């Protein structure tokens, strides 16, 4: 649970390019906000400062079990599928059941967290960029892994040896992405650069305390 100024969910719609004030092409990612709302609001005291623990959620969930349904019913909010909890010192901006306003992100540097594209089971060359063997006639070790350790001593394979396996679908975060534009009517905003994952991927966009407005 991190201490941030603002946090919301987003959905990656795709990438395009726009022109800045100097006529340069800037690659941007179009992100939509899936109407997240505040679920819980708990006030704690730390170093004589009032700190809020906020829980937000998005997307309706019809498969929730009874304890979860009871939890949402107690908070007077609909059943939500994706939840996230964060801490903030802004006491008056988060009310239970209210949606989050995107104007907080305009011209700010944000951190985006998401899952990368899953590529399935991959070999040594694709996953770890290993060099392959000779491709000439007579060679039998084109893409084989080779040795993975010694023999009798130590008689085992050490943990952490790079081998073939699943590639992708890892949680990754990118810091200091600039929010170029915010469309409050359509709940869209433009991020400079790329973000992890495929189109339609759920993103977690957070605004840190160290960020500042850019002129």
Curated annotation (Swiss-Prot):
Region annotation Disordered: where it falls in the sequence: 132-151
GO MF term list: rRNA binding; structural constituent of ribosome
The protein's name in its UniProt record: Large ribosomal subunit protein uL3c
One Gene Ontology cellular component: chloroplast
Keyword Repeat appears in the UniProt entry: no
Recorded superkingdom: Eukaryota
Keywords: Chloroplast, Plastid, Ribonucleoprotein, Ribosomal protein, RNA-binding, rRNA-binding
Subunit structure: Part of the 50S ribosomal subunit.
Gene: rpl3
InterPro entries the record matches: Ribosomal_uL3 (IPR000597), Ribosomal_uL3_bac/org-type (IPR019927), Transl_B-barrel_sf (IPR009000)
Function: One of the primary rRNA binding proteins, it binds directly near the 3'-end of the 23S rRNA, where it nucleates assembly of the 50S subunit.
